[in-house]
Structures are given as structure tokens and as C-alpha cells.
Amino acid sequence: MIHLRPYEASDDALRASILALLSDAFGEEGMPYYELAMDHLYDPDHTFLLSEEDASLVAVALVVDYVDPTDGRWAYLYSLTTREDHRGEGLMSRLYREEMEPRLVERGYRGACLVPATSSLVGFYKSWGFSLLRAADESTPITPGKRATDYLLAAYGEPCIDNPLPFQMIKPFGHTDDSYRLISPLD
């Protein structure tokens, strides 16, 4: 049976399992960044894990705070992955719908955003209620929160990346009439 598992920073075996899952999903060449993310971004409030009864890790999802100074916090969903032998079972969809989104709403996030790892995932995330976002421009004021800024400094030597809003898909948690461009020719 699959169940929600708490994140414990002191659990070295869990850290190794998360790193292995990320490496399998996104490639070994990213290992230095996965390790930096573990050091700066993962914590019990922002990390969602699914495990089997034997404690073997099945899925991982991370929430990174991004801030819009006029509109509040946004949850950047980062490194969402399910172990290959469990893909297609709906585990990540259930984790997002039943655990992540309700907690994000409860914690006062304005919405969630993400970058699909492949174009084939666009339809998958649309089924969660996400919409494609037109290319960001400098008028979009969302920037990394404190933990994300610390990570970016460690990873890249800069507190921000070239594009202040790297998200390609977005899901506001309430009605929006703001300037975020939720309509694209691909929707």
C-alpha cells in the first residue's frame, strides 16, 4: 500500500532515495543541483513524499515559494516525479489533489505554477486545472522567495535567474483578473 511519508532532513537513507529518484527521472548530470536543492529547499513543510509499506520511495514533489509583492505567495511545483514502475497509476495526481493543493490553499498561497519537464506533460497538468502561460516578460513581478533565493545563490552565484517568472503553466486558487496571461494559442 502506498502512503504519505514525512520528510526528515536527518534521514540519510531518505536523502539518498530522493536523489536517486531525481537522477533516474531527470538525469545524472543534474546531481549537483539536486544536492543543492536538498540543502536549501527541502523541508517538512514543502516536501511531499509517497512510500510503499517497506518505506521505499515511490514519488517526490517539492514546493518552492515565489513571491508577487502585490499578490502574495505562489507555489512553484518543482521536481515532481514518480518512480518509473509506478507511473501511470495516478499517484502524483492524487498526491497533488488530495494533499498538496488543499495544504497550499490552507497556507494562503495565491496559486501554483510549474514547468513541465516534457511537452507530453502539458495535457497531464491541464487535467489538474493548470493553464499554459504566455511567455513571461519583465512586467510579471513574481520573484524567488527566501529559500529559493538562497538556492539560486548557491547553484548559480546569483540571487535570481534571467527570467523572473520561469513558469509555463499556472493555476490560480481563486478567481483572477490580474495580468497573468492564462490564454495561449496552445490552450
Stretches found by the model and what they are:
Residues 1-13, 173-187:
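Conserved N-terminal entry element of GNAT/NAT acetyltransferase domains
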Residues 19, 23, 29-53, 59-81:
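A conserved beta-strand-loop-helix scaffold within acyl/acetyltransferase catalytic domains
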Residues 77, 99-104, 121:
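Short hydrophobic clusters on alpha-helical segments that form packing/core surfaces
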Residues 82, 88-102:
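Conserved acetyl-CoA-binding loop-helix of GNAT-fold acetyltransferases
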Residues 103-117:
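Conserved GNAT acetyl-CoA-binding A-motif
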Residues 113-123, 138-144:
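Conserved beta-strand-loop-alpha-helix junction that forms the acyl-donor binding cleft
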Residues 126-136:
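Conserved acetyl-CoA-binding loop of GNAT-fold acetyltransferases
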